[in-house]
Amino acid sequence: MTNEKVNKVALIGAGFVGSSYAFTLINQVITDELVVIDLNQDKAMGDVMDLNHGKAFAPHPVNTWYGDYEDCKDADIVCICAGANQKPGETRLDLVEKNLNIFKGIVDNVMKSGFDGIFLVATNPVDILTYATWKFSGLPKERVIGSGTTLDTARFRYMLSEYFDAAAHNVHAYIIGEHGDTELAVWSHANIGSVPITELMKKNDQYKQEDLDEMMENVRHAAYQIIEKKGATYYGVAMSLARITRAILHNENSILTVSTYLDGEYGADDVYIGVPALVNRNGATEVIELALNDTEKEQFAHSVNVLKEILAPHF
């Protein structure tokens, strides 16, 4: 017999994002057990059947089944992907009213099971709904995490790698703030192989500031472009969720731009927002406070204020 810890993830919501997340978990050897929960039982059961039929090809056997809220009791992570989808022309913040009501029911049911793990929230507007999950659950703030700007940061690094012709894993740069229209690039800390991008710009006149400005707009509007072309975004965010899940279950102490609670950091308080944070088995345990320049401070404060204005009528 073995006494090794068995990692368990409960996924709530088997839509585009949820099913893509489940597929990624199984193929990246991240968890030992995965339970899929959805109001549409046939969809969830169909996903589980489909995933299990490929088990012979998976790099690691993952015990996958369809379940209900009671199965959350001993889960290490409950990942919420359920909720109303963003429609073409609709902002993430337009979804607030619809999804707050949905989340109250979900979180209440999860907590009734005796759940005492970590919530990982993917549904938009993710910063608002992560705050709501924290309020509804009563869990410590570090054990409620949103996907935040992890995907935006990945998009940013990809675009920078293409522009500067460098491998994406050698690009170090962050997108912080609201996962949405007020997010910002931290240009003052962006570098490639430890060389600041500002230095690269000075050394080579083929690099233009207007190109970087356009790049930031492309990062900010990437989701809208994808939704317009294919109806929804799901692969990228699923991979971001899987990355956060790995950091938690494998106790990595990785720094990821998750949506986490601020209590004075960056001059803000009582808000969940995307910033670099230390992520491990205990959740988002420490906010990494970057020294922002004056422009970045102003942009970040604006992002915080937008979120607080949305939260104010509800909490």
Curated annotation (Swiss-Prot):
Regulation: Allosterically activated by fructose 1,6-bisphosphate (FBP).
Binding of beta-D-fructose 1,6-bisphosphate, residues: 157, 172
Family matches, as Pfam families: Ldh_1_C (PF02866), Ldh_1_N (PF00056)
GO molecular function: L-lactate dehydrogenase activity
The family this protein is said to belong to: Belongs to the LDH/MDH superfamily. LDH family.
Protein name: L-lactate dehydrogenase
Catalytic activity: (S)-lactate + NAD(+) = pyruvate + NADH + H(+)
Quaternary state and interactors: Homotetramer.
Protein residues bound to NAD(+): 17, 38, 43, 69, 83-84, 122-124, 147
Gene Ontology terms: cellular component: cytoplasm
Key word ATP-binding present: no
Localization: Cytoplasm
Lineage: Bacteria, Bacillati, Bacillota, Bacilli, Bacillales
One GO BP: lactate metabolic process
Entry annotation: catalytic residues: 179 (proton acceptor)
Residues recorded as bearing Phosphotyrosine in the entry: 224
Function: Catalyzes the conversion of lactate to pyruvate.
Primary location class: cytoplasm
The species this protein was found in: Bacillus pumilus (strain SAFR-032)
Annotated InterPro entries: L-lactate/malate_DH, L-lactate_DH, L-lactate_DH_AS, Lactate/malate_DH_C, Lactate/malate_DH_N, Lactate_DH/Glyco_Ohase_4_C, NAD(P)-bd_dom_sf
Superkingdom: Bacteria
Alphabetical keyword list: Allosteric enzyme, Cytoplasm, NAD, Oxidoreductase, Phosphoprotein
Family annotation (PROSITE patterns): L_LDH
Associated pathway: Fermentation; pyruvate fermentation to lactate; (S)-lactate from pyruvate: step 1/1
